[in-house]
Regions:
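RNA pseudouridine synthases
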Residues: 1-156, 160-188, 192, 266-267
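Accessory RNA 3′-end/elbow-binding domains used by RNA modification enzymes
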Residues: 1-16, 20, 85, 164-282
């Protein structure tokens, strides 16, 4: 996807905020040019998914593309499903799928698994902000919606839901419907992007880099202050803060340094100064 977007846009630098599973569809947030400097903020942001669990079959990949390794005749009822959802909300321990991009001693877990050297995956703490049952499609399938933090796997969630319900299960369908402030309404398909390059400026379909940083306080700079930050120099925070509606900025806070409505730099408040650590070269 990165290569195709680079070719279609002509951008020298292209980044993305989190991979999608091979069988997954939905939102993949792309950053072009200087916006790649903000990708880490999207990576740490919330992601929303809609997925269908197929009960009664466990697969080695925890999705429909894998080989069946265990079956069960148990099919949970709607009430049983609703009763366990609360156990999966908040900070929970989750074992990632063996077929994942996590590195184990320098090698991807999926590469080891394909070479019949499946590694032991260690549990890690992840955060599930919300988990809802949308519908019981039939005895074998249930549809869910989840909002998660960084590092959560819906395939593992489906597997663990099955275990909690006394059966087994895997992801039959998976769609990412939002990443941070971006959702499907703002998304554009690769095919449409291909067609637009011949008919309209792509810039009309790009969102400003500030969209990613909408939850970070913004400080308005004068042109002199902006020039200093662009050169990597710090500026005193007090005059800037006095012009800002944000009166509770603290030591080590990250701020967006702005000039004339454009992002100049991401900066930290240190020792009474605004110190840039990501300067934008627009």
């Amino acid at each position: 996807v990165v290569g195709r977007v680079r070719r279609l846009t002509g951008a020298a630098k292209v980044g993305h905020a989190g991979t999608l599973d091979p069988m997954a569809t939905g939102v993949l947030t792309m950053a072009l040019g200087e916006a790649t400097k903000t990708v880490s903020y999207l990576m740490d942001g919330a992601k929303a998914y809609r997925f269908t669990v197929r009960w009664g079959e466990q697969r080695d990949t925890d999705d429909a593309e894998g080989t069946i390794v265990e079956t069960s005749d148990v099919r949970p009822t709607r009430d049983q499903i609703l009763a366990v959802l609360g156990n999966f909300i908040g900070d929970i321990e989750q074992v990632p799928p063996v077929f994942s991009a996590i590195k184990i001693e320098g090698k991807r877990a999926y590469a080891l698994a394909r070479a019949d050297q499946a590694p032991e995956m260690k549990p890690r703490t992840i955060h599930i902000e919300d988990l809802k049952l949308l519908s019981v499609v039939d005895a074998d399938h249930a549809e869910f919606e989840a909002v998660s933090g960084k590092g959560a796997y819906m395939r593992s969630l489906a597997r663990d839901l099955g275990t909690a319900l006394g059966t087994v299960g895997h992801i039959a369908q998976l769609r990412r419907i939002a990443v941070g402030p971006f959702d499907e309404k703002q998304a554009i398909s690769l095919d449409k992007l291909e067609s637009l390059r011949h008919s309209a400026p792509l810039s009309e379909h790009l969102l400003p880099v500030e969209t990613v940083l909408d939850d970070i306080p913004a400080l308005a700079l004068t042109e002199i202050e902006a020039r200093k930050l662009r050169r990597g120099q710090a500026v005193p925070v007090l005059p800037v803060a006095n012009r800002s509606p944000f009166k509770n900025i603290r030591q080590d806070d990250v701020v967006c340094a702005m000039a004339e409505g454009r992002l100049v730099a991401l900066a930290k408040i240190k020792g009474g100064e605004i110190r840039p650590f990501r300067v934008m070269n627009f």
